[in-house]
């Protein structure tokens, strides 16, 4: 039975905008606070890494001193035992000197061992703190990314509250997917920079501060050797930065098309990595929808980068075959392979590849086992529409 006189009040768009603005302010402030925690943790991480390097050097020095002190103390004890057995052959003054020397060396050895234990304890404490900081940084970055997704989304289509509900839902789902994909790409790029050039430059900074100490302690030859090592690290860091920049570009995909662009990329990949790539193309090399060409290029790129980072392979075979209704891509390496039931370091890249293939309504099959290489088979329908 209908309820007569029942009135449902709907908030006007201005009221909803005020609510969204208040929510945005709260989300924005929370995001900044988490970012500050992340930065503070990162700064402490760098500082502790430097201290850990110094403590490890001191431990090595103390161990060396302890070993030498142990030899001297043992010699002094043997000398004291010899004098004690034949004390009638030595004067009281000689016996006293031998005893004092043995006692002094034993005390010195005990102090060195105590200092070594303290340094080891400090080293272990720093390593534990670094693990906790790393976990804090990763969690903070993930939270910032999630809040950014929410923030960007709230400043987007949700303000258009006057549109039809179904249309809004579709835009919401699509917009959220795009924002999530963007944030995932940013997190991936952030990880690559942090684990690659940023880590290398942090090591360069730490080691550069040791050059002066090495010069004073070990002389100019050792200092010059350290500088040469630093130069190699800087070159490696520069090469890694160039690789990241190179991977971010689609190169001449729009102008050349998929196959010529892949050939160019494969050649550059070989030059940068020393891994031989046997590239084979079967088909006419026609142009296809942009989103299909971009996806195939990124899939091959991601597969080769996974090979470079994790497979320890020397040869890779890449075959692309154009058929009437689909593209088939096969990437096979002679690397170490892996157990698919175990979560591996490179699984993130494979997950991204699977998601990209699913978006194109394709199929991805991985065949691998430990010590037997990896084969990736990708099938993409040519008729896929944007």
Curated annotation (Swiss-Prot):
One of its GO terms (molecular function) is ATP binding. The modification Phosphohistidine is found at residue 194. Its EC number is 2.7.13.3, 3.1.3.-. GO terms for cellular component: cytoplasm; membrane. Gene3D superfamilies: 1.20.5.1930, Histidine kinase-like ATPase, C-terminal domain. Transmembrane segments: none annotated. Autophosphorylated. The keyword Cytoplasm applies. Keywords: ATP-binding, Cytoplasm, Hydrolase, Kinase, Nucleotide-binding, Phosphoprotein, Protein phosphatase, Transferase, Two-component regulatory system. It comes from the Bacteria. It catalyses: ATP + protein L-histidine = ADP + protein N-phospho-L-histidine. Residues 188-384 form the Histidine kinase domain. SMART domains: HATPase_c (SM00387). It is found in: Cytoplasm. Member of the two-component regulatory system DegS/DegU, which plays an important role in the transition growth phase. Acts as both a protein kinase that undergoes autophosphorylation and subsequently transfers the phosphate to DegU, and a protein phosphatase that dephosphorylates phospho-DegU. This is Signal transduction histidine-protein kinase/phosphatase DegS. It comes from Brevibacillus brevis (Bacillus brevis).
